[in-house]
């Protein structure tokens, strides 16, 4: 026989099992709510009631509104069609009671025929459509050959200037007087090369004269020193005529010897009556000292 304690235990056991089952199973309350929401949406779509969608015009900002074009009065001369706005052309057609339907060019032609009949001749060169415009441009390209230019060159005309506009010269400068001296400004390297070339070209004229002819006999007058670039008295002995061999200037020495010239010539031109390939005694002495210092 069952005791009272056994009955209590048996009665509490199913309660605990039910609580364990409830805790182990997830809650289905939100799922049911979602399911009911889906069913409501389906029922609305089934009944044919669609949710209202906002129009894009309602969401436009005030800055996106179309700007109105100011309409000027109708001019006496109608400008070309490409310079007229479509809204302006439509307003002019309404004022003249002309139909503005169709393309812009058609409305332009109707307005010309009604209000500007004298300008109808200008429409001969206007193409009726874009296709006609392409055909006209292709026809022009075929006329002009690839090597020719379509532009026309107009010769310049010599317009005589009136005498009143020509300013009179009062005491004009003496531009045509003979000048005894000339000043030439050239870079140092170019000037040195030019002076060497000038000396070498003039040295060929005096090849028949011996190199020490001027040093053996006293020369009266003045002589031009290549290094100094000035005329010096030629009464003293020691003047030497330079020699050129293999593109180098040589200073003749005793016993048929020659020393290379290390001094740079001046960048000035001598007068036409003086030689420009002579070296003064001081420069000869300086050149000897320079060669000895280089050798030592």
Curated annotation (Swiss-Prot):
UniProt-listed GO biological process terms: lung-associated mesenchyme development
Ranges for region Disordered: 1-73
UniProt KW Cytoplasm keyword: no
GO cellular-component term (any): nucleus
Pfam families for this protein: DCR
Single GO molecular function: chromatin binding
UniProtKB keywords: Developmental protein, Nucleus, Transcription, Transcription regulation
Biased composition (Low complexity): 23-34
Compartments reported by the entry: Nucleus
Tissue specificity annotation: Expressed in pluripotent embryonic cells, but not in differentiated somatic tissues.
Keyword tRNA-binding applies: no
InterPro entries attached to this UniProt entry: Dppa2/4, Dppa2/4_C_dom
Compositional bias of kind Basic and acidic residues: 1-13, 42-58
Knockout mutant characteristics: The mortality of mutant animals is increased at birth and most die within 3 days. The few surviving neonates show growth retardation, but they catch up with wild-type mice by 20 weeks of age.
Subunit structure: Interacts with DPPA2. Interacts with PCGF1.
Known role: May be involved in the maintenance of active epigenetic status of target genes. May inhibit differentiation of embryonic stem (ES) cells into a primitive ectoderm lineage.
Protein name per the record: Developmental pluripotency-associated protein 4
Originating species: Mus musculus
Gene coding for it: Dppa4
